[in-house]
C-alpha cells in the first residue's frame, strides 16, 4: 500500500472523469468486496430498496454540484450514475436495516476521533474502521480539491470512494470527521449524508457556517459530524433526519476529547452492546493517554498489544481499523499510517505537507510486528475472508490467529469465535459435540459473556441436550430473545441459526431475528 496525494485542480468534471478511468479497477474490486459481504438471498430481498433509493436520489439531483461530480466520476468508472448512487445508498441502508440484515451492519464505518492540545498545536487524530481490508488499505488516497469559486478541500479516502468525505480538511482552517451513529429512524425524504457533507463543505466559508448548513438539511439516517478549528474549538453535531443535537468545546479547557460512535443524546435501545463496546474503547484510550511517553499518537492509538490481562477491555483500535490519520492545522501537516491488514503500532507513518503537496516524507519506518500483532492481523484477515464467503481461508486465518495469540483474553475470544463458526457450519452431531465440550471450557471476557451463554443454549438445543444455561444469565435486554430461541419450533430455530453472523471486530454475533 502507498498513500498518494491526488490533485483535482481546475475543471472538476474532466478531472473526475479522468480519475474515474484511473480508479475503475479499484472501484470494481471495492464493489465486489461490499457485495460479497452481502448474502445472495438477503441481497435480493433488499435490492429493490437500494435501487428505489438510488432512483429517488437521482430525481432530486437537478444541477447540484454533488451530482454533477458523481456523474463525471461514474462516466470515468464506466458505470451509470445510478449504479454509484446504489453503492452509496448501501451505507444509508446499513445504518437502518442493520438490525434486520446482519450482513449490512458490517458496512457501517466505525470511528474514533481524538482531539488534543499539544506543544505543536491543536491536533485531530482519526481512526477509520471498515470491513474493507484489501481494498481501502491497498489504495489509500488524499484527494486535494481546488475548484474555482469554491474553498479548497483535502479528503482522506481510497480509490473508488473519492467523493465520499469521511475525513476532510477545509482551507478556512478546520478539520471534519463523519461518524456513523446507531439509530432507529429512516427518513425517506432525506438527503444522502455524503451529499450533505460534500455540498456543505464546498459552500461554507467557515466551520460555523458549515454547521449552519447542516441545520438546513434532512438526513436519511443518523450520523455525527466532529469538527475542530485553528483556535481549538471543537463542534459536534448529530443529525437524524430533521433533528439535530449539538455540543461545543474548547481544547484550551477540555483536552483530550475522545469520540467514537456513541450518540450525543438519547442512546437508542437495541444497541446496548455496541454502546458499551464504544465506551470501553474510549476508556482504554483515555488510560493510554495518561501513560503516554514519547510515542506518536497514531502509534499509541493502534498499540493493540497494550492490553491488560486482569480487568481486560478492548483497545480503541479494532480488527477492522484500515485508516489512521493525524491533522495539524497550524503546521499544515497530515500524518497517515500505512500497513497490511488491520493497522497496528508497528506500521509505518508518512507525512504530507499542505504547503508542498508533492512532498511525501517518512516519519517512522515500519517495524517488525510482535507475536500479538501478527496474530491480530491474522484475525483481521479471518473476518475479511469470512465476509467474502471464503470460509476455508477464513477458518485457516482464524486458526492461525488463535495458535499465535500470546494474550490469554484474546486466545479465549478467538477460541469462542472458532466455536461460533463451527456451530454455523458443522452438521454432524458427533463433531459438534466435540465443539460443545470445547465451548464449555472457554472463559470469555465480560463483553462476550452473553454470547457465550447464547451459544451454549444453541449448542444444547441443536444436540438435544438438557439445558445448562438459563435466560437469567444474559443481560435483561436479551432475555426475551433468549427465551424465544429456546421455545420456537425446531424448523424455525434451525433457519435462524443458519443466519447467525459473527463479527469479531466488535465482539458480537448478530442474529436477524433480534430486533
Identify the residue ranges that each predicted region occupies:
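Short, surface-exposed beta-strand-loop junctions and turns on beta-sheet-rich folds
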Residues: 130-132, 182-184, 242-244, 341-344
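C-terminus-biased signal that marks the final domain/tail of proteins
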Residues: 1-109, 201-242, 250-427, 437-464, ...
Amino acid at each position: 500500500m502507498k498513500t498518494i496525494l491526488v490533485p483535482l485542480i481546475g475543471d472538476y468534471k474532466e478531472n473526475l472523469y479522468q480519475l474515474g478511468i484511473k480508479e475503475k479497477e479499484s472501484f470494481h474490486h471495492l464493489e465486489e468486496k461490499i457485495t460479497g459481504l452481502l448474502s445472495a438471498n438477503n441481497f435480493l430481498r433488499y435490492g429493490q430498496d437500494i435501487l428505489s433509493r438510488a432512483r429517488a436520489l437521482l430525481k432530486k439531483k437537478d444541477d447540484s454540484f454533488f451530482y454533477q461530480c458523481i456523474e463525471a466520476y461514474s462516466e470515468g468508472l464506466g458505470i451509470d450514475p445510478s449504479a454509484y448512487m446504489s453503492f452509496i445508498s448501501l451505507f444509508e441502508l446499513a445504518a437502518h436495516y442493520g438490525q434486520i440484515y446482519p450482513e449490512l451492519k458490517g458496512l457501517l464505518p466505525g470511528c474514533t476521533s481524538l482531539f488534543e492540545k499539544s506543544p505543536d498545536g491543536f491536533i485531530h487524530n482519526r481512526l477509520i474502521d471498515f470491513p474493507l481490508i484489501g481494498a481501502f488499505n491497498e489504495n489509500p488516497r488524499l484527494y486535494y480539491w481546488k475548484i474555482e469559486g469554491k474553498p479548497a478541500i483535502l479528503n482522506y479516502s481510497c480509490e473508488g470512494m473519492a467523493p465520499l468525505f469521511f475525513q476532510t480538511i477545509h482551507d478556512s482552517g478546520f478539520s471534519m470527521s463523519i461518524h456513523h451513529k446507531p439509530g432507529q429512524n429512516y427518513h425517506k425524504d432525506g438527503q444522502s449524508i455524503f451529499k450533505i457533507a460534500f455540498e456543505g463543505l464546498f459552500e461554507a466559508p467557515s466551520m460555523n457556517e458549515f454547521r449552519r448548513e447542516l441545520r438546513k438539511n434532512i438526513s436519511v439516517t443518523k450520523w455525527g459530524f466532529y469538527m475542530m478549528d485553528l483556535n481549538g474549538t471543537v463542534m459536534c453535531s448529530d443529525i437524524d433526519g430533521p433533528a439535530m443535537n449539538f455540543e461545543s468545546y474548547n481544547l484550551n479547557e477540555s483536552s483530550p476529547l475522545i469520540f467514537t460512535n456513541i450518540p450525543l443524546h438519547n442512546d437508542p435501545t437495541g444497541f446496548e452492546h455496541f454502546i458499551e463496546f464504544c465506551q470501553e474503547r474510549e476508556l482504554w484510550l483515555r488510560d493510554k493517554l495518561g501513560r503516554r511517553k514519547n510515542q506518536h499518537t497514531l502509534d499509541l492509538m493502534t498499540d493493540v498489544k497494550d492490553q491488560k490481562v486482569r480487568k481486560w477491555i478492548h483497545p480503541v483500535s479494532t480488527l477492522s481499523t484500515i485508516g489512521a490519520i493525524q491533522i495539524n492545522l497550524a503546521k499544515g501537516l497530515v500524518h497517515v499510517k500505512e500497513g497490511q491488514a488491520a493497522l497496528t503500532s508497528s506500521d509505518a507513518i508518512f507525512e504530507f505537507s499542505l504547503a508542498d503537496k508533492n512532498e511525501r516524507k517518512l516519519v517512522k519506518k515500519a517495524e517488525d510486528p510482535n507475536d500479538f500483532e501478527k496474530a491480530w492481523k491474522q484475525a483481521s484477515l479471518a473476518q475479511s475472508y469470512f465476509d467474502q464467503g471464503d470460509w476455508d481461508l477464513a477458518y485457516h486465518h482464524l486458526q492461525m490467529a488463535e495458535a499465535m495469540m500470546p494474550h490469554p483474553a484474546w486466545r479465549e475470544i478467538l477460541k469462542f469465535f472458532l466455536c461460533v463458526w463451527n456451530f454455523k457450519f458443522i452438521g454432524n452431531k458427533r463433531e459438534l459435540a466435540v465443539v460443545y465440550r470445547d465451548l464449555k471450557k472457554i472463559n470469555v471476557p465480560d463483553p462476550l459473556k452473553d454470547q457465550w451463554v447464547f451459544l451454549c443454549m444453541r449448542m444444547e438445543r441443536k444436540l438435544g441436550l438438557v439445558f445448562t444455561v438459563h435466560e437469567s444469565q444474559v443481560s435483561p435486554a436479551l432475555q426475551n430473545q433468549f427465551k424465544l430461541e429456546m421455545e420456537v419450533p425446531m424448523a424455525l430455530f434451525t433457519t435462524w441459526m443458519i443466519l447467525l453472523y459473527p463479527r469479531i471486530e466488535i465482539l458480537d454475533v448478530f442474529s436477524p431475528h433480534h430486533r
